[in-house]
C-alpha cells in the first residue's frame, strides 16, 4: 500500500461517516493533510504510512491548531517500525493518537470504540475500576483471593479498582470471565479541546536588547500589527497559513506574503479549510494585490491593514472583500 492509496481510503471512510472534507493540503512540510467536520466534530488528520515518521515539532503544531480551532488531531497510518498497525488498537506518538484505517472505520462508521492501546511492553486495556470493585465486593471476594486467581499482587488489584490502571489483555479477559461483566473501558478517539477559549500564551523569550524592532521580518511585523488589533496570534510553521488569529468572537486563518501565483493557490486551500473549520480566512499582501479575494479568502494589502483600528473593523473588511469574490 502506498501513502496515496492510504489517503484515498481515509477520505472514503470519513465521507461514508458523513464528514465534509477540505481540499488536501499539498504543501511541504505540512502539519495535517485534510480537515474534516461532522456537526460539532472537527478533525485535523495527518496521514503517515509509518506513524513513527511523526516528529515532535509537527505533533506540537497539530495540538496547537486543534486547540485553537476546537477540534481533534489524529494520525492515520499503516505501520510502525517493522510491523503493521493492528485493528482496534490505538497508538500514541508525542501525545497524538494514531490508528489504522480499519480502526477509523470502526469508530466513525460502525460506532465501535477501540479497547486496546499500545504502549512500551505490549498491548493494554483500561479497566473500569468502579465496576471491578463492585463485582468483587458483590461476591464478597477479598483483594488477596482475586489477586491469586489472576496471578497479580493485591496492590495491583487495588490500583485497577482505585485508579483504573491499565492491564494486559490476558488479565482483563480473566477478570471478565471471573465476574461475567465487561470491565474494559472504551477509548474515546476524539480528544476535543472543547471550548474555543485561546490557550494561555507561552512566556515570551527574553529578547536581545541589541535586536531592534525594524530587524523583524516583514511577515512578523504584519502579525504584530494583527496582534495590536486585539487578536491572540498563533504563528505556524507547517500549515497552509502563516498564523491563526483569534479574539473572543472570531477565528481567522491568516496568510502573509507578497502577491504571486503561490498566494492564489494557498488562498484557495485556505478558503476550503476555513469552510470546514468554520472560520474566516484572510491573506495580508505585503505590497500590491491583483485580486480582492479568492473564493472565501479575502486579500488585503498591508497599507490597508495599517488603516484598520480594531478587530471588528478587520472582520467587516474581510466580509466586504468576500462580497467582491473574484472567483479566481
UniProtKB/Swiss-Prot annotation:
SS bond list: none
Keywords from the named record: DNA-binding, Transcription, Transcription regulation
Domain HTH cro/C1-type: 132-190
Annotated Pfam families: HTH_3 (PF01381)
Keyword Ribosomal protein recorded: no
CDD domains named in the record: HTH_XRE
InterPro entries linked: Arc_TR_HTH (IPR020886), Cro/C1-type_HTH (IPR001387), Lambda_DNA-bd_dom_sf (IPR010982)
Regions recorded as binding DNA: 143-162
Record GO terms (molecular function): DNA binding; DNA-binding transcription factor activity
Protein name, entry field: Putative HTH-type transcriptional regulatory protein MA_3524
Organism of provenance: Methanosarcina acetivorans (strain ATCC 35395 / DSM 2834 / JCM 12185 / C2A)
Amino acid at each position: 500500500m502506498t501513502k496515496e492509496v492510504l489517503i484515498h481510503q481515509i477520505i472514503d471512510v470519513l465521507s461514508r461517516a458523513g464528514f465534509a472534507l477540505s481540499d488536501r493540503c499539498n504543501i511541504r512540510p505540512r502539519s495535517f493533510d485534510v480537515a474534516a467536520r461532522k456537526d460539532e466534530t472537527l478533525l485535523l488528520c495527518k496521514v503517515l504510512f509509518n506513524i513513527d515518521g511523526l516528529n515532535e515539532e509537527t505533533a506540537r503544531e497539530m495540538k496547537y491548531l486543534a486547540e485553537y480551532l476546537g477540534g481533534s488531531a489524529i494520525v492515520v497510518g499503516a505501520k510502525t517500525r517493522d510491523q503493521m498497525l493492528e485493528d482496534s488498537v490505538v497508538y500514541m506518538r508525542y501525545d497524538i493518537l494514531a490508528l489504522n484505517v480499519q480502526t477509523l472505520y470502526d469508530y466513525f462508521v460502525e460506532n465501535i470504540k477501540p479497547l486496546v492501546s499500545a504502549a512500551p511492553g505490549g498491548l493494554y486495556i483500561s479497566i473500569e475500576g468502579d465496576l471491578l470493585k463492585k463485582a468483587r465486593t458483590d461476591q464478597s471476594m477479598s483483594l488477596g483471593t482475586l489477586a491469586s486467581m489472576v496471578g497479580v499482587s493485591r496492590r495491583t488489584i487495588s490500583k485497577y479498582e482505585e485508579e483504573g490502571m491499565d492491564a494486559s489483555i490476558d488479565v482483563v479477559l480473566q477478570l471478565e470471565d471471573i465476574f461475567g461483566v465487561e470491565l474494559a473501558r472504551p477509548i474515546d478517539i476524539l480528544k476535543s479541546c472543547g471550548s474555543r477559549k485561546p490557550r494561555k500564551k507561552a512566556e515570551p523569550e527574553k529578547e536581545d536588547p541589541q535586536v531592534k524592532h525594524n530587524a523583524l521580518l516583514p511577515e512578523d511585523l504584519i502579525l504584530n500589527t494583527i496582534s495590536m488589533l486585539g487578536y491572540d496570534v498563533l504563528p505556524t510553521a507547517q500549515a497552509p497559513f502563516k498564523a491563526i488569529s483569534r479574539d473572543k468572537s472570531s477565528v481567522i486563518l491568516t496568510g502573509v506574503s507578497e502577491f504571486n501565483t503561490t498566494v492564489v493557490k494557498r488562498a484557495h486551500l485556505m478558503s476550503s479549510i476555513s469552510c470546514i473549520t468554520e472560520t474566516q480566512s484572510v491573506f495580508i499582501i505585503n505590497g500590491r494585490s491583483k485580486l480582492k479575494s479568492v473564493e472565501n479568502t479575502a486579500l488585503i494589502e498591508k497599507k490597508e491593514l495599517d488603516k484598520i483600528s480594531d478587530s471588528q473593523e478587520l472582520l467587516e473588511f474581510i466580509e466586504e472583500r468576500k462580497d467582491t469574490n473574484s472567483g479566481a
